[in-house]
Amino acid sequence: MSRRGTAEEKTAKSDPIYRNRLVNMLVNRILKHGKKSLAYQIIYRALKKIQQKTETNPLCVLRQAIRGVTPDIAVKARRVGGSTHQVPIEIGSTQGKALAIRWLLGASRKRPGRNMAFKLSSELVDAAKGSGDAIRKKEETHRMAEANRAFAHFR
């Protein structure tokens, strides 16, 4: 048993312009090769495009998209007696948000289009409306958890 104490959970810092933690979480996930200024540019351009498309507050659209994509339950592979079962587990709010952001960015990277800001803005607007690849991924995860409900006692 470890003598070290449990690590304190760090609170996410907020970004300089919108003063929002979700935007900063998004920036840190979109980051590639340490180019944080480029990540900020992409996010801010995407939010500006959302403002132009929907004529509403882009932060509201972002919150709505993340709320729509956040899963309540997921499956985890658990090995029991030589066979691997997909065991459904509940997900906390922080982990759910992180998954939602990862799915949104993955779906926007797969989209055809000009640049990442355009693709991200389109995916966020679609997710806020309840469509898009990220929403499909959430529904697929929920279906998997529902199908494997019989193994829930293996937790």
From Swiss-Prot:
Keyword rRNA-binding assigned: yes
Compartments reported by the entry: Plastid, Chloroplast
Subunit structure: Part of the 30S ribosomal subunit.
Keyword Transmembrane helix found: no
GO-annotated biological processes: translation
GO MF annotation terms: rRNA binding; structural constituent of ribosome
Chief location category: plastid
Alphabetic keyword roster: Chloroplast, Plastid, Ribonucleoprotein, Ribosomal protein, RNA-binding, rRNA-binding
InterPro entries, sorted: Ribosomal_uS7, Ribosomal_uS7_bac/org-type, Ribosomal_uS7_CS, Ribosomal_uS7_dom, Ribosomal_uS7_dom_sf
Similarity comment: family membership: Belongs to the universal ribosomal protein uS7 family.
Name recorded for this polypeptide: Small ribosomal subunit protein uS7cz/uS7cy
Gene designation: rps7-A
Gene3D superfamilies: Ribosomal protein S7 domain
Task of the protein: One of the primary rRNA binding proteins, it binds directly to 16S rRNA where it nucleates assembly of the head domain of the 30S subunit.
